[in-house]
Regions:
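Non-transmembrane alpha-helical segments in soluble domains
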Residues: 11, 26-29, 53, 89-93
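Glycine-/proline-rich flexible loop or hinge segments
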Residues: 7-11, 30-36, 44-49, 66-81
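Short, exposed beta-strand "edge-strand" segments with a Pro/Gly-rich flavor and a Y/T-containing core
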Residues: 4, 41-44, 84-89
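Short, structured active-site-proximal loop/turn typified by the sulfatase FGly-forming signature C/S-X-P-X-R
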Residues: 17-60, 100
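Detector for methionine-enriched segments
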Residues: 1-3, 22, 35, 102, ...
Length: 132
């Protein structure tokens, strides 16, 4: 029996009410079962993704925001990438299945079978660009 494939699309602000305005996503979703997650709190990228990937609340996975103050180094650290920062087993580890984790945070040193790590670039004028 073939394993059921699952795709988790993490798109900020995407709700069922706007899928009809997106032709490709609308067609893709018509052929599949579409489900929603309860929004994570706080609603910031790193915390939300860590909650979705572990199934745990912030108090258990430990990622309280996109950055934190490091007392030892006396500096604020933003957008760190090591998967070792996220406490707890990931959903694919619990399910013992193969996983491709593409462009999510905390991808470095992840146990996912396939991954690509985002690398944002911040020019001095305040813009933000994504790269890999």
């Amino acid at each position: 029996m073939a394993m059921k494939r699952i795709a988790v699309l993490n798109v900020v602000g995407l709700t069922r009410s706007v899928i009809d305005d997106m032709p490709r996503l609308r067609e893709w979703s018509k052929k599949r079962e579409v489900m929603s997650f309860k929004p994570a709190f706080p609603a910031v990228t790193c915390t939300a993704q860590s909650s979705y990937l572990t199934g745990k609340p912030v108090g258990e996975h430990g990622i309280v925001g996109n950055g934190w103050y490091d007392r030892e180094d006396a500096e604020v650290k933003f957008w760190k990438q090591s998967n070792h920062l996220v406490k707890g087993k990931k959903v694919w580890e619990e399910a013992e299945v193969r996983c491709a984790k593409m462009f999510w945070w905390y991808n470095m040193y992840s146990s996912a079978d396939f991954s690509a790590t985002p690398r944002p670039l911040y020019p001095a004028d305040g813009r933000k660009f994504f790269d890999i």
